[in-house]
């Protein structure tokens, strides 16, 4: 649909959306793909453990866990759901595993890709993002850039504008130039 609306399509996504942006970059041609803190694995776990974690989560019964077990339903912002299903995490990690495996054997369809990581990331695996960029670069992929959001306290959700503090405003200093540059 987007291709019919203009001559250059830029796709950007955060977390699970970042994973789907990276998947799209691997399989489809877009002008520029910007994967922001893509959910390719879990922070502090070695990337090679992701397939085993995926299998375990798929085998276990689905449960809903709190994003923050201390704040529970008081977690802000109000428009966000305070829990997540383990089955959704398993399926997202399954997409990540398939993407990483495909990237090891084939170049991405998209020639211009930016992966943005948060140096104070607490949720997703920056190591997995670096591994994916390395796989793409090993195939001589066009332009694969790694950019980093720096200077934030430990966090994952760096773009939520209603979150207390200045996370989003500070993250936008890195993100907006990348997104504005997408038109080149």
Q: Which residues make up each language-model segment?
A:
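Conserved acidic catalytic loop of the alpha/beta-hydrolase fold
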Residues: 1-10
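A structural motif
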Residues: 56-85
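Gly/Ala-rich beta-loop-alpha elbow adjacent to hydrolase catalytic centers
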Residues: 12-21
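Serine-hydrolase catalytic core
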Residues: 80-153, 167-180
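Active-site nucleophile loop of the alpha/beta-hydrolase fold
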Residues: 34-45
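Residue-level signal for short, function-critical loop segments
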Residues: 15, 39, 119-121
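Active-site signature of alpha/beta-hydrolase-fold catalytic machinery across serine-
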Residues: 23-27
């Amino acid at each position: 649909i987007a291709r019919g609306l203009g001559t250059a399509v830029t796709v950007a996504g955060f977390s699970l959306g970042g994973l789907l942006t990276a998947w799209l970059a691997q399989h489809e041609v877009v002008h520029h793909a910007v994967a922001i803190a893509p959910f390719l694995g879990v922070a502090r776990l070695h990337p090679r453990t992701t397939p085993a974690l995926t299998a375990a989560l798929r085998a276990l019964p689905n449960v809903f866990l709190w994003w923050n077990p201390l704040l529970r339903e008081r977690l802000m912002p109000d428009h966000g759901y305070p829990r997540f299903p383990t089955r959704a995490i398993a399926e997202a990690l399954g997409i990540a595993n398939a993407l990483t495996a495909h990237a090891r054997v084939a170049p991405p369809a998209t020639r211009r890709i930016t992966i943005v990581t948060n140096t104070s990331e607490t949720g997703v695996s920056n190591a997995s993002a670096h591994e994916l960029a390395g796989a793409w670069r090993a195939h001589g992929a066009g332009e694969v850039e790694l950019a980093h959001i720096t200077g934030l306290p430990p966090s994952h959700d760096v773009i939520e504008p209603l979150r207390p503090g200045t996370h989003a405003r500070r993250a936008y200093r890195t993100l907006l130039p990348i997104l504005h540059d997408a038109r080149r």
